[in-house]
């Protein structure tokens, strides 16, 4: 039997999405239906390369998005599975491949509601099928404006989940303090801005907050020191084995800022598998994962969030009940078999359709491609309006008021990655992007 060929394309291969991708591809690889291979436009980290060698799955990394050999590979494969988030190399690939025929499915690893990770018509129209990782994404404005026939043909939703991965086998480790834990991105681009203040306000004796992850843990640690609560908080930075820390958590507190880009929230699933009650805000994908009052609490305010933590501290029987419910719910809903079956169904659906022309947004010959891709990916938001206004002054100075507006933008727009100006400027040698970069350094 000749296997059909599926080609996965990802901006880079590593981190949280990398773990989900490895689990999915490996389990698809074990089936007889499709041969799997992966192209990473940027890097594949050592963990991914070791995984590739151990399992006989080909990885090609540092592949140029404009390389004709990649375009030919995409045209020759039966299914092209693109893993989406705002990354300059991915946008460059979609633009440069436009006009060619293949069968594309895009799986979004961002929820699409907030800049710089907004969905847009160019992204939604490019594939034959667009797959979200959370039902929260189905309420995004560029999806809801489409008619029901279009959505029925082109929109699907499959949770981002790497399976139980023995997180359900974690046994609690005895400890002397009441441990409230967080794992994941430690950066205000994702975490609630009052993260430290909320923990400090919770009236819990003998408490230890264990914050696992990076990359801004050092600056947040210094903030806790300045606020006089460093004795309550332990920042670990990135760790190689998160299970060791989950074994010591009594409660999993996951307060994200409202406009975060998350989707499947794999760390929530891991906590649930381990039987740790979860506390989240009623914003975005988190409330689609946590079963309010059953596996944990979904809070509508900072006050409710703190009260939920205090309630779990003071009620041992409730914690045990929610722990058991969490394990049960995870085993029923988050095994890897479910997404594997869903993906095979989508692959078969794609095979039933002929290869079609992929059309991306066209730009005028007078438009600057790098800047146009950056602004397209950024979408309709305050940052985009400010940058467009600044560019009207290029290459001269801009009014002070406009500079100050740029300086007041959230940190995510001025970071080194995540679709920021610096991110695009690092891949495109472009004077206008370098000009815009100046205003990100004024914060």
Q: Could you say what each language-model-derived stretch is?
A:
Residues 7-9, 160, 166, 172-190, ...:
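Conserved donor-binding/catalytic core segment of Leloir-type glycosyltransferases
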Residues 255-269, 281-288:
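Nucleotide-sugar-dependent
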Residues 56-58, 221-239:
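Nucleotide-activated donor-binding/catalytic signature segment of Leloir-type glycosyltransferases, i.e.
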Residues 115-121, 125-155, 162-164:
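A short, active-site helix/loop in glycosyltransferases that binds the activated sugar's phosphate group
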Residues 38-45, 183, 208-221:
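Glycosyltransferase donor-sugar binding loop
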Residues 40, 273, 277-280:
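Short hydrophobic beta-strand element within catalytic cores of glycosyltransferases
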């Amino acid at each position: 039997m000749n296997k059909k060929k599926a080609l996965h394309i990802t901006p880079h291969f590593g981190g949280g999405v990398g773990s989900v991708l490895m689990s999915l591809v490996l389990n698809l690889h074990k089936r007889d239906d499709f041969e799997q291979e992966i192209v990473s436009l940027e890097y594949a980290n050592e963990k991914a390369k070791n995984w590739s060698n151990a399992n006989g799955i080909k990885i090609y990394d540092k592949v140029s998005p404009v390389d004709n050999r990649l375009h030919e590979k995409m045209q020759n494969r039966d299914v092209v599975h693109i893993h989406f988030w705002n990354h300059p190399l991915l946008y460059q690939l979609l633009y440069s491949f436009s006009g060619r025929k293949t069968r594309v499915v895009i799986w979004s690893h961002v929820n699409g509601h907030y800049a710089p990770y907004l969905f847009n018509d160019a992204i939604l129209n490019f594939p034959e099928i667009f797959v979200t990782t959370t039902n929260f994404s189905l309420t995004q404005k560029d999806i809801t404006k489409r008619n029901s026939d279009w959505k029925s043909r082109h929109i699907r939703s499959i949770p981002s989940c790497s399976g139980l991965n023995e997180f359900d086998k974690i046994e609690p480790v005895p400890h002397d303090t009441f441990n409230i834990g967080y794992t994941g991105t430690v950066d205000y681009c994702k975490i609630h801005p009052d993260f430290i203040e909320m923990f400090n306000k919770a009236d819990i004796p003998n408490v230890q907050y264990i914050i696992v992850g990076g990359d801004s843990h050092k600056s947040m640690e210094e903030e806790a020191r300045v606020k006089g609560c460093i004795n309550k908080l332990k920042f670990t930075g990135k760790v190689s084995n998160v299970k060791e820390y989950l074994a010591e958590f009594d409660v999993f507190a996951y307060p994200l800022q409202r406009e975060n880009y998350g989707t499947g929230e794999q760390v929530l699933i891991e906590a649930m598998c381990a039987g740790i009650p979860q506390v989240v805000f009623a914003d975005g994908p988190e409330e689609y994962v946590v079963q309010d009052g059953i596996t944990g609490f979904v809070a509508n305010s900072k006050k409710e969030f703190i009260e939920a933590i205090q309630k779990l501290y003071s009620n041992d029987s409730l914690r045990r009940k929610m722990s058991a419910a969490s394990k049960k719910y995870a085993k029923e809903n988050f095994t890897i078999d479910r997404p594997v079956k869903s993906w095979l169904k989508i692959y078969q659906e794609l095979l039933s359709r002929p290869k079609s022309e992929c059309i991306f947004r066209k730009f005028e010959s007078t438009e600057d491609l790098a800047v146009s891709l950056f602004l397209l990916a950024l979408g309709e938001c305050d940052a985009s309006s400010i940058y467009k206004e600044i560019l009207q002054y290029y290459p001269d100075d801009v009014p002070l008021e406009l500079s100050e507006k740029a300086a007041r933008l959230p940190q995510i727009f001025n970071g080194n990655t995540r679709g920021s100006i610096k991110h695009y400027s690092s891949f495109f040698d472009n004077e206008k992007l370098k000009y815009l970069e100046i205003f990100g350094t004024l914060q």
